[in-house]
């Protein structure tokens, strides 16, 4: 995280896990032996999960454009 505040936001948005447990409480006390198991959640876009809403929308638009246009254009004659 870029700052303490950013870390808090990542935790509240369920992007962080300790071991196999997803943490969403910023005051969660991590034991000393569990510190090495702090990682991004598997369902988080940061941890290799499904891309976020905006990225999926942009990928869909790029695929549509690559396949021959979006169909919204009208021919001007």
UniProtKB/Swiss-Prot annotation:
It holds the Pfam family S4. One of its GO terms (molecular function) is structural constituent of ribosome. One of its GO terms (biological process) is ribosomal small subunit biogenesis. Residues 52-63 have a biased composition (Basic residues). Residues 45-77 are annotated as: Disordered. Keywords: Ribonucleoprotein, Ribosomal protein. One of its GO terms (cellular component) is cytosolic small ribosomal subunit. Belongs to the universal ribosomal protein uS4 family. This is Small ribosomal subunit protein uS4.
């Amino acid at each position: 995280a870029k700052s303490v505040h950013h870390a808090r936001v990542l935790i509240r948005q369920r992007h962080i896990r300790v071991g196999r447990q997803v943490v969403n409480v910023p005051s969660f006390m991590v034991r000393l032996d569990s510190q090495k198991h702090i990682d991004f959640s598997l369902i988080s876009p940061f941890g290799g999960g499904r891309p976020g809403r905006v990225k999926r929308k942009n990928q869909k638009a790029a695929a549509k454009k690559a396949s021959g246009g979006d169909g919204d254009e009208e021919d001007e004659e």
